[in-house]
């Protein structure tokens, strides 16, 4: 397809696994310590990842992701559907956004909405646990 994927992973072990199994460049970093080149990427795919970013850091992280996209670049993200509550599941932190809050964050950090939807298909929308959204720089 002509894509040249680059991975970002917080676990050094998973970085090595991803590099070996894909042959792609995979950076060892997390959203808190992003160090991506500016205006480099046509698209970012952040599936089940951004909700692990602490609420007080999400605006900065989203601006940095926006900065790393080329003009008119696209961001896809998917987060568990929630009511703006935060907490831990074992040792894993999560902030569970509702649509209005997530939309406000994305708009305030320079993104334009393309579409949003709840997934997976095949069950009533109000029971779908994942909020997916697509944004343009």
Show where each model-derived region lies.
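Acceptor-substrate binding/catalytic loop of class I
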Residues: 53, 85-101
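A short acidic, Gly/Pro-enriched loop at the edge of an enzyme's catalytic core
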Residues: 32-44
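Conserved beta-strand signature within the Rossmann-like core of class I S-adenosyl-L-methionine
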Residues: 72-79
């Amino acid at each position: 397809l002509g894509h040249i994927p680059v991975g970002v992973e917080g676990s050094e072990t998973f970085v090595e696994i991803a590099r070996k199994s894909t042959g792609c460049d995979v950076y060892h970093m997390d959203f808190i310590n992003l160090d991506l080149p500016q205006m480099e990427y046509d698209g970012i795919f952040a599936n089940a990842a951004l909700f692990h970013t602490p609420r007080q850091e999400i605006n900065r992280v989203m601006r940095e992701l926006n900065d790393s996209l080329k003009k008119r670049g696209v961001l896809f993200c998917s987060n568990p559907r929630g009511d703006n509550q935060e907490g831990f599941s074992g040792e894993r932190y999560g902030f569970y956004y509702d649509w209005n809050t997530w939309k406000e964050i994305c708009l305030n950090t320079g993104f334009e909405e393309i579409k949003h939807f709840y997934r997976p298909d095949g069950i009533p929308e109000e029971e779908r646990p994942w909020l997916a959204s697509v944004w343009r720089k």
